[in-house]
Amino acid sequence: MDANSKDKPPETKESAMNNAGNASFILGTGKIVTPQKHAELPPNPCTPDTFKSPLNFSTVTVEQLGITPESFVRNSAGKSSSYLKKCRRRSAVGARGSPETNHLIRFIARQQNIKNARKSPLAQDSPSQGSPALYRNVNTLRERISAFQSAFHSIKENEKMTGCLEFSEAGKESEMTDLTRKEGLSACQQSGFPAVLSSKRRRISYQRDSDENLTDAEGKVIGLQIFNIDTDRACAVETSVDLSEISSKLGSTQSGFLVEESLPLSELTETSNALKVADCVVGKGSSDAVSPDTFTAEVSSDAVPDVRSPATPACRRDLPTPKTFVLRSVLKKPSVKMCLESLQEHCNNLYDDDGTHPSLISNLPNCCKEKEAEDEENFEAPAFLNMRKRKRVTFGEDLSPEVFDESLPANTPLRKGGTPVCKKDFSGLSSLLLEQSPVPEPLPQPDFDDKGENLENIEPLQVSFAVLSSPNKSSISETLSGTDTFSSSNNHEKISSPKVGRITRTSNRRNQLVSVVEESVCNLLNTEVQPCKEKKINRRKSQETKCTKRALPKKSQVLKSCRKKKGKGKKSVQKSLYGERDIASKKPLLSPIPELPEVPEMTPSIPSIRRLGSGYFSSNGKLEEVKTPKNPVKRKDLLRHDPDLHMHQGYDKYDVSEFCSYIKSSSSLGNATSDEDPNTNIMNINENKNIPKAKNKSESENEPKAGTDSPVSCASVTEERVASDSPKPALTLQQGQEFSAGGQNAENLCQFFKISPDLNIKCERKDDFLGAAEGKLQCNRLMPNSQKDCHCLGDVLIENTKESKSQSEDLGRKPMESSSVVSCRDRKDRRRSMCYSDGRSLHLEKNGNHTPSSSVGSSVEISLENSELFKDLSDAIEQTFQRRNSETKVRRSTRLQKDLENEGLVWISLPLPSTSQKAKRRTICTFDSSGFESMSPIKETVSSRQKPQMAPPVSDPENSQGPAAGSSDEPGKRRKSFCISTLANTKATSQFKGYRRRSSLNGKGESSLTALERIEHNGERKQ
């Protein structure tokens, strides 16, 4: 047993080891399994394996069971499993991983490396492929890079060697091979590495390698090596190759090659040799792989290497070498010197390294001279064209490749329309531009100063501007400007003080620029630099002087300045337009409640009223004439009479209606349609309760009876007759008691109306007309609830309502004065407005505004009164119109007046220029309308009384008027009598009830109804 027990622990160890091996094997197979932790632990005697075999407890010892004195003693730190576990746990905390995890990570990394090496075709040929341990052990980027370098070194080196042999001279080949080896190692490592590394890593590695190689090769290749690194990296670049060969090879090479060539181009553009080299390289490069446009675009752009196509990422990164710095410096700071210095340094490096520099330099100028014209032509024009496309920014005219004036600091923005200094082509271009720019010379209107002085000032100004704008320009530009710049600056300062001379300066500057271009190339260059400055100067002057001439100075510049001037002019014009707009906007007020001008609205409201009334009465003029004088006097008297009548007979609305109808009938005795009229009047009265319907019915019925207008009047008069024939006459007499005594008053009224039969007829006509007009207006107004009229006729209706109120008050007074025609006339004037108010009152009766109904009754009485009353009524109408004109109508909300049916905004005349009585009546109308609404039960009782007495249709309109009268009793007896008179008048003139209803609408929107009624009366009176 002891032996077994002793053997078992080794078995456990072996099993643990085997398990670990299995784990690793499993990992090798692809399964990821962490090695068993107990593999490293010391064997535990008490493992389940020990208990696998049957134990004979009689013979089993404690050791076999794992119980030993050692088990009770702490094992050494290295031996105890618990301690090891704790250590592992502790080490694992915050640590990269436990031994198991580290082992797993390493194994996985190895497996991945092996797979990558197998997959990558380049790695297959690499010598390191035979030793996967290299890949397995590769833990750092450098190791990987070295592995790839070793793998691709031979291939890349061979390729580069062949390229070098093809393009380089014999003595240069060895140097080329060295350079290519250096570059090739990095390039091959990086080029082969891309399979594993990302493009960014490749670029970075290329940059590193290219930077290292460039330090050696920059001088030799003159920045061309970087291009060759991407393709046949060092070989084609090396100075041994002629520029023609180099350019052809570069053309064959990727665009990246041209990218770095663009750097030398930017550098060489300043020097003729450099320009020639760049042109040659660009020419061939464009013909081969990259177009000169892209090349020039690269030159123009600060991040030329970044701008290059993705095929040349290495070259892009290679650019950050001193060459790239040179290009950036060219863009940022003076640069011609920098480029020359950088080139010189490269040449010196070539001298030292290969001694091939002289040949390269000689080759460069030769090739450049040969291809100068072709390359410059092909390169420059498409170059700046493509530059425009690529940059998508055009500073005025097309920019030549010299747009970036190397003499100027890179951060100096190009002047719009201006081009940087160029020695050859740009001078011609600048001369052309200068010649073109002076085209607006005839425009220089401000010749306030002498031209000579202006010319003198202009040249220094231009130079000074150039100097000031570009203080960092090359010494050439400064020397060209020379002392002239200082003198020009002084002159400019002198001239700057007078703003008037500035305009002349611009024109003179143009002339001077042309002359300068003719004088010398240096002057042309200065002027070329100056055009932008001049543009700026012109802009400044234009801004300061704001003269139109400044827009003329130069084409592009002048156009821009003109645009600015035009814009300013437009702004000024816009201001005027805005002012007009303000005025226009003032016409339609922004407020949702437009305040209608009284006079203009009154006139349009008249035709609208006529239109409304025309349907009911054909003879508008006739009815208007009768109606105008008749209604005011009658209304006044009747208003007086009706209030008293209604007060005495208060609730006998039927009697009141009878009296009104009797009065109307008496007034309409001359009319033969009395029989027809009763029904019509009854219909009208009923319709007056239902204002729109009553109006339409009464008017429609009245029209067939005696012509559209006259039948209406006749109908209203006959209604009065019928009322008088029936117990209504008695009621009318009772109401007439206000004038005298019951029936006598009625007779007096009849007589009063008959005082002048013609006038009475006119009054009847007018009453009828007013009734028809009121019916119409009621129909049209009541249907929209006087909203239409409130808007257009609100002012007139308000005034009419005021007048109707005052007239109703007068009528309340005039029942006693009814005997006197003069008082009736005075009342007529008011009653005219009262007639309107009557129509409104009828409408208000519907709406709960009963005051207008009483005014209607007064209008009926007016119709019964003499022709003098008609005259007075016409006068009153005129006065009402005048009052309306003088009055300012304002819409006010009836929110506080809960009794008014018409809720919302109502037209009210604030000044109420009408008589105090009218003003009171108006206020009473509006105020009483609410009171009338509160009095509606009384009205209902009166209407109920009148209904049994009157025919139901007649009683209905009477009820509509009667409630108005009843309600008017509480707020004011005048109001009641007014409503009663309107009830009688509703019988007499259901059309007047329409008017009254309109006026009642005016109670809510009194102004609109009153305005409509007044307009109708005026139109009728005029007709």
UniProtKB/Swiss-Prot annotation:
The modification Phosphoserine is found at residues 98, 120, 126, 131, 210, 291, 309, 400, 407, 437, 591, 614, 710, 756, 936, 977, 1000. This is Cell division cycle-associated protein 2. The keyword Cell division applies. The keyword Lyase does not apply. Residues 979-992, 1000-1010 have a biased composition (Polar residues). Residues 389-449 form the PP1-binding domain. It comes from Homo sapiens. GO terms for cellular component: chromosome; cytosol; nucleoplasm; nucleus. It comes from the Eukaryota. It is found in: Nucleus. Phosphorylated by CDK1. May regulate its subcellular location. Pfam families: PP1_bind. The modification Phosphothreonine is found at residues 312, 412. Residues 561-573 have a biased composition (Basic residues). One of its GO terms (biological process) is cell division.
